[in-house]
């Protein structure tokens, strides 16, 4: 094979490399930059009690990747139509990072409901505190949330050992379990952040090889 043919082959290789790099980035899309994470939810054990205007529920949560996108909780209405607002705050120490409100009237009995955060909430230490209250609710017109201390497997229920900080607290009193909550978060991937640097390094390597033929 003569030099002319080699150079022609190198030009083709460079063109193919560029096309493949662009195609891989386009096909990979957001999956190159981050992955979505969901924690396992505890099985519903018992309701924590009516959440009235005199009630504050707190619990620590772990946010893998440090970016909170949403929560899924299990609520109950006591088989009645209630009104008011469930106020959900995400705190880092005394700092409120995010706040969302849930329309109590729209909640279904003994069912999951979702809370989305837009924009995504950045959690500095990958841990945060949930603070839940219902400032308008009174006894007989309030909802509740489920707590649990076990998790369902393929064959049976497995008890989960919870530390004190992992338990739910109602008005500062530790409850027998943690909130049945699924934490939705996002973890940034280094590959996506440095993809074009990696692609450029590969392109330069191919170009240098061709130059020294």
Residue ranges of each PLM-predicted region?
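Beta-sheet-rich sandwich/jelly-roll-like modules and their strand-loop junctions
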Residues: 2-92, 105-114, 119-125, 134-210
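Surface-exposed loop/edge segments in extracytoplasmic proteins
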Residues: 94-102
């Amino acid at each position: 094979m003569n030099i002319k043919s080699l150079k022609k082959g190198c030009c083709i290789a460079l063109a193919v490399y560029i096309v493949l790099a662009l195609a891989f980035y386009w096909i990979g899309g957001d999956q190159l930059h981050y992955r979505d994470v969901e924690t396992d939810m505890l099985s519903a054990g018992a309701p924590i009690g009516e959440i009235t205007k005199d009630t504050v529920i707190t619990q620590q949560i772990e946010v893998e990747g440090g970016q909170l996108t949403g929560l899924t909780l299990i609520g109950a209405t006591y088989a009645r139509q209630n009104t008011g607002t469930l106020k959900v705050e995400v705190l880092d120490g005394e700092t409120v990072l995010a706040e969302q409100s849930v329309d109590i009237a729209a909640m279904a009995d003994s069912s999951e409901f979702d809370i989305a955060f837009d924009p995504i909430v950045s959690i500095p230490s990958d841990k945060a505190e949930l603070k839940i209250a219902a400032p308008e609710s009174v006894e007989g017109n309030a909802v509740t949330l489920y707590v649990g201390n076990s998790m369902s497997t393929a064959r049976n229920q497995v008890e989960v050992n919870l530390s004190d900080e992992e338990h739910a607290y109602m008005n500062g009193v530790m409850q027998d379990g943690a909130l049945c909550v699924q934490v939705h978060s996002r973890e940034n991937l280094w590959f996506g952040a440095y993809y074009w640097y990696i692609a450029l390094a590969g392109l330069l390597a191919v170009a240098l090889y061709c130059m020294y033929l």
